[in-house]
């Protein structure tokens, strides 16, 4: 199938791009034809993102500033310790009488009414506490009275701890003689709900969570517990509101030192959490990687991860007192080859549980990269999946629209599976430039989400698409030039073969790797069909002999036109690889590529002879041959000569290199045999499922065998994942190991529903990667 013929007008020019792109940026104009507008946009945007790595910004919090404003002076308890915070509250009330995110584009819509209620009530209490701002108090009360029904509305999204914090503030307001026009029954109901929530936390032994929201408990909280959760900087979980409440109720000097340091840094208003630099920079790395633009920021990413690893080794509180940061740090460090254990993450999830959806979400992502030996200590980590499924099915109304979608996608598309470029496209299309986060109140950081990331990701995606289209055209010409399209017995899968590498080795500079991968993918498909149905045993043997001899007279040595076409195409591809790889490796690797092809064809010949002779091998005998005959060797092994690092003969012949290949190929063979069992059984072909049924325990049915084999695939995958991620003792460069890992993702994709190439459902996905424009679904939507 020629994909180009399936798509009308596939070549998208700059002018035919979707309007979404022009909405993101104003295109640069060239001067005298010397400046490429796209390159100028990319370079300028990269510079802006690089600056974001140096300066972390976070919005101030009306809610937390109000709690800091309530703190009395140690020397004069009837006076505020931080009068500048009171002045800030007076000067930053919103037009409708509420307090919330200041200078925020969506604030006027009150996407989180409960957040506005708790922030506004905290500000009213702070002002009343010191008898200032009477006009602001009255306007705030009017807002609360108009929206108080939302406090008990289960369909409204809730900040963390709202069911404890808001009733606590109501009680505090009542003690200050603040008269809210609310029904006594509603007030009693909220207090009762607070009591139930407190009991639930105690029964589940999540005292750390109660400490985090302790300002809502007042006299119900044992303030002596503060020391257990007090960090070295004097704060309670880096929360200004909890720390302020702790000082008000316990006069802990460390708490006051923390609050003073906050005001020294931020002036007259504070954020909802501080410090947050490490988490924000990790979020930047995560976002950049998800959007497919990490190749632009390799130095910045390494600097962030090196610093994070230093903090991990030193057991820095920024990591180990917060589930979200710990889970994110663990995942990014492990994926990038740093030696980290999940034990600390398991410990913190046991202590703090999942205080919000983001905590569960990040922990679930981390659970995807646990090794087999991690599973016993990571039971609490694995519970994150159940938590996410539970909130989707029973309590989805309290989730924001954005988080709800993130949870759905996390469960549907696990973070460590799937094809890189498919994930990138989906992440770009769903990206929200106004990703406001929710803790006890909402906050925003331009480091976490902004238009620069999206602008660069879109331009980069289209740049890559234009490269892919040209490479695919060249491959289609190569197929015709080598007469492979004339082999009627063979499947024509040029677009599929190219797609499999464009979706994984996506960077522009990896063009040689993509061409090598795709050419050999095309050839292995054709050769597989030749050994399967297109050739006689004599022809198969003749083809192998020609490759072994190499310098042959095709007119004399090839026994048929089919053999002639196949040999010349193989020689053309192998010689091209040898010539181009020399530029990367500074040595001739042609003999290794030839040997890889010979290993494949000999394994295929062995299977053909077994079939001819009606020989039934043992399962072990079959698998030792079948992982090679699955034909991934010629695709992956030559391609890794083009991904960057130099590969010595020692590396290529090492047991580590062989194990990488065997684990990858075994997974592929088992997936293929599971999905093609019924068809191959009818055709009388050898298959692992059939052999397992015939050689295994009596009475086993197909479903049981398939279940066992799927578990085997899962274990092989975890074993391979460990080989890929771990650097200690490894001699195969990471970029090369990633090629084996990427092929596993390709296999999972192709065998998700059908037995590899026999399904047509992937055609739309192929178009998405190579041809179709992006559709930015969040561009004109309100965030919540």
Swiss-Prot record:
Mg(2+) 2 binds at residues 528, 532. InterPro entries: Isoprenoid_synthase_dom_sf, Terpene_cyclase_plant_C1, Terpene_synth_N, Terpene_synth_N_sf, Terpene_synthase-like, Terpene_synthase_metal-bd, Terpenoid_cyclase/PrenylTrfase. This is Ent-kaurene synthase 1, chloroplastic. The Asp-Asp-Xaa-Xaa-Asp/Glu (DDXXD/E) motif is important for the catalytic activity, presumably through binding to Mg(2+). It comes from Stevia rebaudiana (Stevia). It is found in: Plastid, Chloroplast. Accumulates in leaves. The gene is KS1-1. A motif (DDXXD motif) lies at residues 528-532. Transmembrane segments: none annotated.
